[in-house]
Amino acid sequence: MEKSFEDVLVQFYIDQYRENAKKSTGKPVKLAHYIHRLNSKAKSIKYARFSKNETVALDKLHQEIKRLALITYYSNNKNAKHILNREIIPQLVRVDMEQFDEKEAEYLTEDFLKLLRKEYIGAICTRSMKALYNEYRSKELRREIVTLVPARPELEFPKAQSMKRRFILHIGPTNSGKTYQALERLKLAQNGVYLGPLRLLALEVYEKMNDAGIPCTMLTGQECLEVSDSRITASTVEMLDCDKEYDIAVIDEAQMVADDDRGHSWTRAILGTLAGEIHICMSPVAKDVVIHLINLCHDEYEIREYERKTALKLEDKPFSFPQDVKEGDAFIVFSKKSVLNIAGRLEENGIKPSVIYGSLPPEIRRRQMTLFNEKKTQVVVSTDAIGMGLNLPVRRIVFLEVEKFDGVSRRPLVISEIKQIAGRAGRFGLYDTGYVTALGQKNLNYLKNTLNIPEQDIDIVSLGFPQVLLTMDAPLDAIIKLWHEAEPSAPFRKINVDEILFLYGYAYKERYFIADFDDKYLLYKMITCPIDIKDRELVRQWLRYCMSYTSDISLDKPDKHSKYQGLMKYESYYKKLDLYYQFSVRMGKIVDEDWLENERDKTQAKIMQLLSKSKDEYIIRCRYCGRILPIGNSRNICRDCYSMIRR
């Protein structure tokens, strides 16, 4: 009668424990004592249950049985061997097998046991079968990753490698006119593309081109504004089609190539854009790494360097708030809470501000900028969003803070961040000089000292996940983790995968309700949908779409109900509208364009209405006496109340 595979497994365990015992030097023992221990273990293991992936406890169980097996096989007692071989080890096999899901269990074959006998001799005596399986699969997957992914990133783009491309590098600081020159050349294209970091910049190019009589389409993750017979596509860099050929391309803000989260899109654009003429606009710090990428492709390049068109001066005296406020000032802080706090204080002093921060919808940011451009507001309060190519008539940049939270910790601004923001002062054509200052002598000294330090060149290039790995026979999260663990050669560094793994984990809990969860191409589309994972209402809507996208030709409309209040409620709803559009496009669903445009318009109007109202409620006050706190106070309590509490 042919043995079942379970019997084969039991025999494998017995053989491994017996072989391990032969290598050990036995010592005289009281056999009766060990018979008692064997019976006790046989009884306890019969009812043992372990949660999935409880590997430490399972390994410990294997080690306990190893000690019992040493005595059993050394003593060669028939009764002891019966208890071990017929009662304990079969139950150990059961416990081990309960750790495997149905798909994983397919790998447990006689060939796999042969491999364990050869490469993992005796390992089952100290480690669970799942631990050995995980180690083996990891090794196999790493080998497969090395096989599938070219050793050199440029080889992932064979079409671009086969072309003769010429790069023109426009290198200069902010307000130097580098992007203007590249766009002037783009106007001559019959089939051109602009690739920028922000929807607002794509919109600016879209409007300038169409105003100049050059048909231009805008394409971003949030929307598509299609113009018939367009010669130019203005888009965010993530939207690049690496299979489409252009005659001229412009890649803007290429110093972003080092960004942990989005930098891989610039790397992909430089290595993979199919255009005979490619203009790259960047800060001087990115010059060497961008040239390195071009050299990898054996393409030609020329360098055009630009000087700042207006002088930039650091003021001698620190800024005092609100006494020193002047029209044309831009106040820099690093959170939405701080932006609204400063805006409220300015309004208290009769000064109308525009506000710019990351969670504002792009169209609202644009309207706030327009108010400032048209002098309907006197100043602007912004996060570092102001530093990324936004053209505003700013006379002076005022750093109210010189520290920011970067997602991990609160840290001082680095020189590249200071220069990027400070460079927005003194718009060419409006001012001869741009000014920079900071609140308080300590902050001003920090700016002064930091600006004297030579800016470090970028020495990192971000690499994205290669989708060729989606062909591998393994869970998607395991593939992503193993790919990320493998260190690339300098100057490459792999993108941060924390957010997509978070979304994978969120979806995995509901995998039985997600159609085609095992389709890695489909699942990867879902988990790389760009959403704010800090907004849990948004994450829940994303999960609902994952579970229901096959139900109809269109997705359900976003839920207006929210636990949030005021501005946050409408900002979150706007993000839900963006998710409705993005998920629909990714999954081939029909978008109700008229409804979406109407909802966006209504939501934008509501946000603008709320921003036009008094921001007194956002001013940070002492939680005890209600007194307005000094800017930068981190305790939410005034000095007098703090002193009273400390008495």
Where are these regions (language model features)?
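Post-DEXD/H (motif II) to motif III coupling segment of the RecA-like Helicase ATP-binding lobe
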Residues: 256-307
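Conserved Walker A/P-loop ATP-binding site and its immediately adjacent core
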Residues: 176, 180-183, 188-211, 286
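Conserved helicase ATPase core of P-loop NTP-dependent helicases/translocases
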Residues: 224-226, 354-355, 360-383
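Non-catalytic terminal extensions of ATP-dependent helicases
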Residues: 1-147, 466-647
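Conserved strand-helix element at the start of the C-terminal RecA-like helicase core
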Residues: 191-202, 279-281, 324-349, 353-357, ...
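Conserved segment of the helicase C-terminal RecA-like domain
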Residues: 285-286, 392, 396-399, 403-406, ...
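Inter-Walker segment of RecA-like/P-loop motor cores
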Residues: 209-245
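Conserved interdomain linker/interface between the two RecA-like ATPase lobes of SF2 helicase motors
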Residues: 168, 284-287, 293-295, 299-345, ...
